[in-house]
UniProtKB/Swiss-Prot annotation:
This is Holo-[acyl-carrier-protein] synthase. Belongs to the P-Pant transferase superfamily. AcpS family. HAMAP family: AcpS. It comes from the Bacteria. It is an enzyme of class 2 (transferase). GO terms for cellular component: cytoplasm. GO terms for biological process: fatty acid biosynthetic process. Mg(2+) binds at D8, E62.
């Protein structure tokens, strides 16, 4: 049953600007250790592909945080979720620490799709609850 959906789009030039202003530290803030290693490998081959990778991961984390209904609030942190690829190429979120426990307590799994094209990176996430009812809207 669908628990929540999230989407995000970012202009790759904005990420490039942040990287320039932070002397590259933005990647270290946003990417988990496995993502960071993959980012450096891609960047070594092509600056443009490295930037696209970073942008898709940023968008994926934003979309993921929206799908689970937390936004970027604890236990959802930049490095608590890494988006890696299965051997088939399918992107799969790997959650760590308290975020993994939070998702398990609620019986949630999340699927993420990412894409980039020249100027933009986009991500879409669907959070699902196994066998449970869909989340109900919360009155504000």
């Amino acid at each position: 049953m669908i628990y929540g959906v999230g989407t995000d789009i970012i202009q790759i030039a904005r990420v490039q600007g942040v990287m320039e202003r932070t002397n590259g530290r933005f990647a270290e803030k946003v990417l988990g250790p496995d993502e960071l290693a993959k980012y450096h490998a891609r960047k070594a081959r092509s600056e443009k592909r490295g930037l696209a990778f970073l942008s898709t991961r940023f968008a994926a984390k934003e979309a993921f945080s929206k799908a689970i209904g937390l936004g970027m609030r604890w236990p959802m942190t930049w490095r608590a979720m890494e988006l890696m690829n299965l051997p088939s190429g399918e992107p799969t979120p790997i959650c760590h620490g308290e975020l993994a426990a939070w998702l398990a307590e609620r019986g949630l799994s999340v699927r993420v799709s990412v894409s980039d094209e020249h100027d933009f990176a986009v991500a879409f996430a669907i959070a699902e609850r196994a066998g449970g009812a869909a989340s109900q809207p919360t009155a504000l």
